Curated annotation (Swiss-Prot):
Described function: Forms an efflux pump with AaeA. Could function as a metabolic relief valve, allowing to eliminate certain compounds when they accumulate to high levels in the cell.
Family that this chain belongs to: Belongs to the aromatic acid exporter ArAE (TC 2.A.85) family.
PANTHER family: MULTIDRUG RESISTANCE PROTEIN MDTO (PTHR30509:SF9), P-HYDROXYBENZOIC ACID EFFLUX PUMP SUBUNIT-RELATED (PTHR30509)
Gene Ontology CC, one term: plasma membrane
Keyword annotations: Cell inner membrane, Cell membrane, Membrane, Transmembrane, Transmembrane helix, Transport
Record-given protein name: p-hydroxybenzoic acid efflux pump subunit AaeB
Length: 652
């Protein structure tokens, strides 16, 4: 049996039991919030990771939950103070706040959006709970208690991780950076040999995903300890180098489509030999550097030269990452990075739809609840807020809503067993209560790390409906109201997601592809500050988004990669410096920007035709000013690419 698979269930059980004990020991009014928080922080991170989560990821999620809770409590108190005499307006403002938070959370990094999503539904939960209890004057006390209980739950989850063998991401990083470079070499082998196009596509898309994942591990590592600061600096540079290796290899393949003789025979012979580990790469790089020195730069393809330089720098940083040693003078030269450009989100319409879904779902639910006085309304409102706030940030919100619905359905019989049979029998013994909840948490932990659908929702839903109040009372009617309310709330959230369809997929894809086009056009510049800007991480981040939005659509990925290659080549090209070309570069950028900004296909088509005509004129100007081949060739390739894929870039 793989005993390490039991590590997370033990952590989850300890966190839940410890938060329960602390909650009852300090006489908290609703200890279940502490228990639920420990379950959500530890369980949600494990569900996302598909196993025992890294320590950094768990702590990061915990900190975001604290921030989101405080923001939500402040917003709830502000809204209640301002609209204390108008309950309907109060609920409407809370729904607007939830929608605003979801809209903003959809525009920022998904790692940090958790805090905003939480802030949105925390305010709604506080207002709903206070209204359900019928005493608005208790709102400040309720907000303070909620913050305290959530902090207790988070501390318990982090403490459990620290006690039971915390899983550091460092060893995974060490293994991945070695394996990544070996696979980068294999991609270059295939590109030099001009092998099967489908195999090349499979390799580079896999490398893009792994490079993105490796960059995510860097964030988890920094959450573990500040002693990894030097590794963080190296990994930032390593991310750009890995992306540069992919770009140079793909360009080598692309050039050979039109120039079979691009790679000299000696390099074909060199890359025929296979590599198995990082030691083989070291040996190959030493030989390659000698071959390039002997052959001379004029007889060595530019892409191969750039690839070898990037791989050599990668090896230099790799050693420092393994040892966490002080940064040497040579490394410092490599780490003198260019300013990294950050692009604004391409999912503005997707974010707007998410915000509208949240607002509509919570507003309709709250108005129906206030109008009818429905006993299960508060439970339904809580689940509506939670699902619409959290599910909307996921790549597949419908699947997450179904997961919660299945979980809440399972929670009804499971919660009934605990609430009506097990818990009344353990009223005289805290030990028996802890054992009974611990067994459920342990089994749930095993299923959660397997990503069993409905498990996380079922565990959280069960803990929510068995109340765990202090003092404990057993009101079966209230229990059934809560159980049915949260199940109905999940169903209504699922219904809203189905009715308000997200039609932004094609628009987002078109914006992303046109941004690749703009980046390639904007690279044609004689402005040194603009040429120094590092667009590569941002461009590949958008390519990664394209991979997720259109999985399996290899043609779109090829277009994007071709435009990224064009951007990198034009960025390094020796464009003649004169006022005429500089003015024309500005005109090209303006026209490309108009293509992105156009709101109709007709306008977009007109501006695109104008851009193609301007590129033809620009090529004539380059010939007139005797521009070298390393300028005219990539410009011609860019113009041909835009003509070939014109329809795709205008309308997906």
């Amino acid at each position: 049996m793989q005993w390490h698979r039991l590590r997370f269930p033990i952590k989850l059980t300890f966190a839940i039991v410890l938060s329960l004990l602390i909650g009852f020991h300090f006489n908290l009014e609703t200890p279940r919030w502490a228990v639920m928080t420990a379950c959500i922080v530890a369980g949600g991170t494990a569900f996302a990771a598909g196993g025992d989560p890294f320590s950094g990821a768990l702590r990061h999620r915990g900190m975001l939950r604290i921030i989101g809770t405080f923001l939500g409590c402040i917003a709830a108190l502000t809204i209640m103070i301002a609209t204390i005499r108008a309950p309907a307006l109060m609920m409407l403002l809370c729904c607007m706040w939830a929608g605003l938070c979801v809209w903003l959370s959809s525009l920022i990094k998904i790692e940090n959006s958790y805090a905003l999503g939480l802030a949105g539904y925390t305010a709604l939960i506080i207002v709903v709970s206070v209204d359900a209890n019928g005493s608005v004057l208790l709102a400040p006390q309720f907000a303070v208690e909620r913050c305290s209980e959530i902090i207790i739950g988070i501390v318990c989850a982090i403490l459990a991780d620290m006690l039971f063998s915390p899983r550091s991401v460092k060893q995974d990083i060490d293994r991945e950076i070695d394996a990544l470079l070996v696979d980068q070499y294999k991609l270059m082998q295939l590109c030099v040999a001009h092998g099967d196009k489908e195999e090349v596509d499979r390799l580079w898309t896999n490398l893009v995903r792994r490079t993105t994942a490796l960059n995510g591990m860097r964030g988890n590592l920094m959450m573990e300890s500040s002693r990894w600061q030097k590794i963080d600096e190296r990994m930032r540079a390593l991310n750009t180098l890995s992306l540069a290796l992919i770009t140079q290899a793909a360009e080598t393949y692309l050039i050979q489509d039109s120039r079979k003789e691009y790679v000299p025979p000696q390099f074909h012979i060199f890359f025929d030999k296979s590599v198995e580990n990082i030691g083989d790469i070291h040996k190959r790089m030493k030989i390659m550097r000698r071959v390039i020195t002997t052959s001379g730069s004029k007889n060595t393809p530019v892409t191969l030269q750039n690839w070898v330089v990037a791989a050599t720098r990668y090896l230099l940083l790799l050693k420092g990452i393994h040892t966490n040693s002080s940064i040497s003078r040579i490394e410092r030269e490599v780490l003198k990075d260019e300013p990294v450009v950050k692009m604004r989100s391409a999912e503005s319409r997707h974010a707007m739809i998410n915000g509208i879904r949240t607002f509509v779902a919570t507003a309709v639910g709250s108005l129906f609840w206030l109008w009818t006085g429905w006993a299960s309304g508060s439970g339904a409102m809580v689940m509506l807020a939670v699902i619409t706030a959290l599910a909307m940030r996921m790549p597949n919100p419908l699947m997450m809503a179904k997961d919660f619905l299945y979980g809440m359905i399972v929670a009804i019989p499971l919660g009934s067993l605990y609430y009506m049979v097990i818990m009344p029998s353990t009223q005289q013994s805290m030990l028996l209560l802890c054992i009974s909840l611990g067994v459920m948490a342990f089994i749930g932990g095993i299923l959660i790390q397997r990503r069993q659908i409905g498990t996380l929702g079922g565990l959280v839903g069960t803990i929510n409906i068995i109340t765990l109040d202090n003092p404990m009372t057993f009101n079966v009617t209230a229990f059934l109201d809560n159980a049915l309310g949260q199940a109905i709330g999940c169903f209504l959230a699922l219904l809203v997601i189905l009715l308000i369809r997200d039609t932004s997929k094609a628009r987002t894809g078109r914006i992303l592809l046109n941004r690749f086009m703009y980046a390639a056009v904007a690279a044609m510049s004689t402005n040194q500050a603009r040429r120094r800007e590092n667009h590569l991480p941002a461009l590949y981040h958008q390519l990664f988004m394209l991979l997720n939005i259109f999985p399996g659509d290899i043609d779109k990925f090829r277009i994007a990669l071709t435009l990224i290659i064009g951007h990198q080549r034009l960025r390094d090209a020796d464009i003649p410096v004169n006022e005429d070309l500089s003015a024309y570069h500005k005109q090209l950028r303006h026209t490309a920007d108009q293509v992105i900004a156009a709101r109709t296909d007709a306008k977009r088509h007109r501006y695109f035709e104008q851009l193609l005509a301007e590129l033809d004129t620009y090529q004539g100007k380059l010939v007139h000013y005797d521009a070298p081949l390393n300028v005219t060739e990539p410009v011609k390739r860019l113009a041909n690419t835009l003509k070939k894929y014109q329809n795709t870039l205008i309308q997906i």
